[in-house]
């Protein structure tokens, strides 16, 4: 299963991601993956982590290692950006490098900060006609599929402006066995037909099952 943190801007999603990772860290899961929008956010991640008592050096960017060499990090939080996640060079890929480091029995946290960056994974109809799925979205889904025991956290204040953009959230159980929808395509087409009301039902059901939280800062005062 996964969890969707949909808190609004300024509510402290980065701090909550750090807290989720720290909770697992203290339970002995000392390898975790933090996927974020761009490299400068490394310092933001370290700020949130150290504010909770972690060490600055616990979070290491994947850019510390070349794409064709193994990641030498016995324990820590691997910081990966979405553009890096999709990068390839010859027979080597960052995705393979990450999964090799994590190992098949990986059960730590994969935190997708700004998860809407994976929004185009399913492709679909754009203003200029049909478009293919985005590579960084596809790589994000593959990372989840390759590490089935991972604890997945999606964080985004704008989770899905269009229902098609929820296709990356494969751990929320919105389609598949024991749901009303056989596959992703059926889920997307059915919810799209229902419009805004159907989207609100999806959010309500996710909240009712404890898989979604969306709080906002008060304007009082």
Describe the residue ranges of each PLM region.
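Conserved Walker B
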Residues: 8-9, 114-116, 157
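An amphipathic alpha-helix signature
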Residues: 18, 42, 163-167
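Conserved P-loop NTPase motor "coupling/switch" region that bridges the ATPase
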Residues: 109, 129-220
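Short, well-ordered alpha-helices that flank and scaffold nucleotide-derived cofactor binding pockets
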Residues: 19-26, 47, 145, 168
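SF2 helicase/translocase NTPase motor core
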Residues: 4, 14-15, 25-139, 179, ...
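Walker A/P-loop
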Residues: 2-20
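Pre-Walker A (Motif I) flank of P-loop NTPase domains
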Residues: 1-5, 30, 148-151
